Structures are given as structure tokens and as C-alpha cells.
Amino acid sequence: MRVALVEKFGGPEVLIPAELPDPVAGPDEVVVAVDHIDTLFVQTQIRAGAFGEYFDVKPPYVPGGGVSGTVTSTGAEVDPAVWAGRRVIAAVDPGSYASLAAVPVDHLVPVPDGLGLREAAALVHDSVTALALLDLTALKAGETVLITGASGGMGTLLVQLARARGARVVGVARGPEKVALVRELGAHEVVDAASTDWPRHAAEALGGAGADVVLDGVGGELGAAAFPLTAHGGRFSAHGAPTGHGFAAVPADEAGRRAITVLGIADVQLTPSRRVALATRALEEAAAGRLRTVIGAVYPLERAGEAHAAIEGRGLVGKVVLSV
């Protein structure tokens, strides 16, 4: 099978095309002929050698993420009448940057009719985390939510899902193109993070009380600046760190004094069955036209290094996916 292989830690150039033996389905697995591959910013950081304390990954390795495709073979304990030839998505980590993937059958999510495999791939991870965050923070109709990184793969989904829950949505994005996209997706107000004074503009957009929920997918200084915008008794989620400067630093004394519930990425580590349930919800919403996937660029698998460079360049909106 064809793969994109990280030969050593480093820049995007270390991600090279290679050939590996085709996988064989284990007893409770299927083999998926991959159509499109979901990419995650964290994979660019792992490739660069970061987060070794969280991810036990050593080169050479095939990066992980998610795939969409068609089941081509089934293991001895898998019913081929149910799964053979079926369009599916699945989280595959490591090993998703490949033309074939062996996947446990209980990790599969069928793709409904009317939804393309490219769009389905873009939902493998981000939609699951987005739905989990909204469930975890218990965002309700009539509440106000501040979403940083609102033009990214998960941010674009959060904007739509929060709006669908009846919340008032204030997005934070950088630059006029990204601001326009977030507004188009349904945000009531959008603040341009390119302005050094963006926290003041966000405070004005939120009103005097602040945000009932802050969903910070950026981290670093921007995430830290978003924390004071949380209302008394609100919920603050620090779940993203694409800046390379870590998750948002939250002063515990202030959080306690203002009765703010602080959540992190550890709070959305989900069981396979929970992931499947949330992904099923997301695919159904997308197939019905109620959830739009924003795909900023598509690169062939052989150019995965270029895809990583584009992701790190931060110029694109939405998701970057790989085609096989």
C-alpha cells in the first residue's frame, strides 16, 4: 500500500511517500480502501517532535487521524453481509496516511447516502470533539458562547452547532476572509484577532456579563486573553494549542473566585463507542444539510508534506484533507 511516512522528526519535508505491505484484517477487523484522510494540526506538532510526553511516537511512522473509504475485506468474526462494500469513516491512529487501513469493526461509522466521502473525512475527529465539548459544557439556548479559532476545522463546526442549540455566538478569527466565513456560518458577532485590542472588542460583543461558555481552540496568549471574558459561574474549555505555546494558562485562584468551571482536552478523551455515537450524529446532520464542512484545501497523499506546510502556514480556512 501507499503511505506517507515520517522518516525522522523535523519539518514538513520529513513526510515522504513510501510503500508498505498491505494490511490484513484481524478477526474483528475490516480493511478499508481509503478515499480521503482527515488531517489534524497536532500531527504537524508530533511530526516536529513535540508532545512526546503525550504521544509515544518514534520515527519512522505513518501519522494518524481519520479516514473515509469503502470496506474491501472483513475478518473472520465480522459479518460481510453487513460491512462488505460499505462506505465508512473511522479514527485510525497511527496509520491513517495510507491507501489501506485495518480498522476494528466497532470503530466504524457508516456514511449516510447523500454525503460525500471527502466531506465525511473532514468530520472524523473535529465533529466528535465539537459535539463532546458542547455536551460537556452543557451549552443551552439563550446562553452566549465565545469561540476562538472559529475559522478552523473544529471552529467552523462549533459555530454552526452552537447556533443550532439556540446560543448567541461570538467568534474570534484572524483576518477579513476568516471573519467573513465565520459570519457566513451563523455567528452573531465576529472579532478580528489581528487587532491587538481584540479582547476589548470581544467584551463589547459579549455584553457586560461576559460569555457563559468560552471554547478556546487556540491556546497560548490568545487563549489566556480569552479567559477573563468568561462570565461569573461560566465554563471555560482550553482544548486547543496550535500556537505551539501550550494550552491557555488559567489562573486557578481567579477561576475559583469567579466560580468558573475549567475544562481541558483530557475531559474529551472518549471511548470508541462514544466516538462512534457522536460521529453518527454529525454525519446525519451533514447529510441532512444542517452541518456544513469547510474544506480549505485537498492534497494528494503523495504531497502530505505540502499539506502539513499549508496547515502550519495558517493561511487556509477550515480543514485540509488528503486524497488517495
Residue spans of the language-model regions?
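Short amphipathic alpha-helix with an adjacent loop that forms part of the alpha/beta core around
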Residues: 197-208
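NAD(P)H dinucleotide-binding glycine-rich loop of Rossmann-like/cofactor-binding domains
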Residues: 45, 56, 65, 87-151
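Mid-domain Rossmann-like dinucleotide-binding core that forms the NAD(H)/NADP(H) cofactor-binding site
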Residues: 127-195
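Glycine-rich phosphate-binding loop and adjacent beta-alpha segment
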Residues: 221-290, 324
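C-terminal hydrophobic helical "lid"/dimerization subdomain
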Residues: 273-324
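Short, well-ordered loop/turn sites that connect or cap secondary structure elements
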Residues: 82-83, 139, 230
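Short glycine-centered segments of the SAM/dcSAM-binding site in methyltransferase folds
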Residues: 87, 144, 168, 234-235, ...
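Glycine-rich beta-strand-centered segment in the early N-terminal region that forms part
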Residues: 21-38, 51-94, 217
